[in-house]
């Protein structure tokens, strides 16, 4: 939904019914069949002397957006897109920490608190206690708990195609699945391909007018909406937040 364009037209006096949007008008109420998660990108890897405790001061230099069919998929897509070398809600430094130290850490509200929170959930710590310590909405904590539950399923079922398919639908990367199955990323990729577990591209269509909108996101659920053409194409490569 082109918020900026619609807002500008409203500002010059146009009514919603007069503003065309994707084959309809801006008066049509948007209907969503996807979820979006945004994660801030903090540059503490470049500014190593900066304090990474978060507060009211702006410290992020950008953000990433993960689009998916479920909250878990959005979380994991976003984490991978941060370009911090992390491919999952997992950091070894937190895996090595005692539980009481993790509880102390999550009350300090740092840029990587979400990874410490995930480690506590991975250890079966109470979501209610974690919520009380961080005030993170339980909806998000429960999504992380489902990610941790899928980790357990994968560990208990190495090379299992059903588990692999379920993990991909939840947003797991081949690289992290490989680490749980003590193999390499390419082996997981080949296993997926051999069993027809490949992503589709779904359309971001909020108005459902039937018009094709070339705004797509990948997912392992649903039907493919991408239309291939013979037109010339370009790839725009972005750098990082700095």
What is the role of each PLM region?
Residues 1-163, 170-171, 195-199, 228, ...:
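ATP-dependent carboxylate activation and anion-phosphoryl transfer catalytic cores
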Residues 23, 186-188:
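Catalytic domains of riboflavin
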Residues 141, 188-189:
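Helix-turn-helix DNA-binding helix
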Residues 170, 176-180:
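Extended, domain-scale alpha-helical bundle/helix-rich regions
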Residues 189-242:
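Non-catalytic terminal/interface segments that mediate subunit docking, oligomerization
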């Amino acid at each position: 939904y082109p918020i900026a364009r619609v807002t500008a037209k409203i500002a010059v006096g146009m009514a919603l019914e007069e503003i065309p949007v994707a084959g309809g008008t801006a008066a049509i109420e948007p209907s969503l069949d996807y979820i979006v998660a945004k994660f801030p990108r903090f540059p503490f890897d470049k500014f190593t002397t900066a304090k990474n405790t978060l507060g009211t001061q702006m410290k992020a230099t950008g953000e990433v957006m993960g689009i998916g069919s479920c909250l878990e998929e959005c979380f994991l897509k976003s984490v991978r897109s941060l370009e911090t070398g992390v491919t999952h809600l997992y950091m070894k430094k937190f895996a090595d920490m005692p539980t009481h130290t993790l509880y102390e850490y999550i009350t300090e509200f740092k840029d990587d608190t979400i990874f410490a929170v995930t480690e506590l959930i991975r250890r079966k710590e109470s979501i209610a206690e974690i919520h009380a310590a961080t005030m993170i909405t339980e909806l998000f904590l429960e999504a992380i708990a489902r990610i941790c539950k899928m980790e357990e399923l994968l560990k208990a079922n190495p090379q299992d195609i059903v588990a692999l398919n379920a993990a991909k639908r939840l947003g797991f990367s081949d690289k992290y699945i490989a680490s749980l199955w003590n193999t390499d990323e390419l082996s997981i990729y080949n296993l997926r391909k051999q069993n027809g577990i490949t992503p589709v591209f779904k359309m971001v269509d909020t108005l459902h007018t039937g018009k094709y909108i070339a705004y797509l996101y990948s997912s392992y659920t649903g039907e493919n909406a991408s239309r291939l053409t013979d037109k010339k194409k370009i790839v725009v490569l972005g750098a990082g937040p700095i």
